[in-house]
Swiss-Prot record:
This is Vacuolar protein sorting-associated protein 28 homolog. The gene is Vps28. Belongs to the VPS28 family. PROSITE patterns: VPS28_C, VPS28_N. Residues 131-227 form the VPS28 C-terminal domain. One of its GO terms (molecular function) is ubiquitin binding. InterPro entries: ESCRT_assembly_dom, Vps28, VPS28_C, VPS28_C_sf, VPS28_N, VPS28_N_sf. Its main location: cytoplasm. Residues 20-127 form the VPS28 N-terminal domain. It comes from Rattus norvegicus (Rat). SUPFAM superfamilies: Endosomal sorting complex assembly domain (SSF140111), VPS28 C-terminal domain-like (SSF140427). GO terms for cellular component: cytoplasm; cytosol; early endosome; endosome; endosome membrane; ESCRT I complex; plasma membrane. It is found in: Cytoplasm; Endosome; Cell membrane. The modification N-acetylmethionine is found at residue 1. Component of the endosomal sorting complex required for transport-I (ESCRT-I) complex, a regulator of vesicular trafficking process. The ESCRT-I complex participates in the sorting of membrane proteins into vesicles that bud into late endosomal compartments called multivesicular bodies, and is also involved in the budding of many viruses.
């Protein structure tokens, strides 16, 4: 009597031990990159640096394709360069000594961004300080620098006033800015406040909060002007 051929699993069939993951609850466990808060911060910092470099690469490509205006590009690139410096300081150490090493380690292929980082200026910037794009880059950088200092609780008069004065002088060099530009008025008012303080005097919590709000508003107004 013909008993037939023993049944065999179909093509692509998996053994029971593989096809039934329910038998292995460990497969559903979350895999964490870190074991403690310090390690988590380390990976967060590396992720921030990675994101900044990728964003800068995308911005460079957008500018090459004429998708952003020179003024918009200059402001955005200047902001990213400031953010890059802050992000890299958080990562730099025994494991990562340079941005080149960081890119090799994480296979980050962003040649346009690397060129911007090494030149430390947007491609629109020339060497002369009277150049419009140089002024735009300096204004963006100084706005961010002062706001970062305040967020880091650096609030002494002699630590804030020099950058704020330079910001004011740079805006004055921009003939394109209208005389009644609100950002210029905001910075001027705070310079007057600081001029009435001694070098060691510090802004109180209320003043820091208000100054941050005012500078953020002025910075946003400057960006709106660039897009107009």
């Amino acid at each position: 009597m013909f008993h037939g051929i023993p049944a065999t699993p179909g093509v692509g069939a998996l053994p029971c031990s593989v096809a039934a993951p329910g038998n292995k609850p460990e497969l559903y466990e979350e895999v964490k990159l870190y074991k403690n808060a310090r390690e988590r911060e380390k990976y967060d910092n590396m992720a921030e640096l990675f994101a900044v470099v990728k964003t800068m690469q995308a911005l460079e490509k957008a500018y090459i394709k004429d998708c952003v205006t020179p003024n918009e590009y200059t402001a955005a690139c200047s902001r990213l360069l400031v953010q890059y410096k802050a992000a890299f300081r958080q990562v730099q150490g025994s494991e990562i000594s340079s941005i080149d090493e960081f890119c090799r380690k994480f296979r980050l292929d962003c040649p346009l961004a690397m060129e911007r980082i090494k030149e430390d200026r947007p491609i629109t910037i020339k060497d002369d300080k009277g150049n419009l794009n140089r002024c735009i880059a300096d204004v963006v950088s100084l706005f961010i620098t002062v706001m970062d200092k305040l967020r880091l609780e650096i609030r002494a008069m002699d630590e804030i006033q020099p950058d704020l004065r330079e910001l004011m002088e740079t805006m004055h060099r921009m003939s394109h800015l209208p005389p009644d530009f609100e950002g210029r008025q905001t910075v001027s008012q705070w310079l007057q406040t600081l001029s009435g303080m001694s070098a060691s005097d510090e802004l109180d919590d209320s003043q820091v909060r208000q100054m941050l709000f005012d500078l953020e508003s002025a910075y946003n107004a400057f960006n709106r002007f660039l897009h107009s």
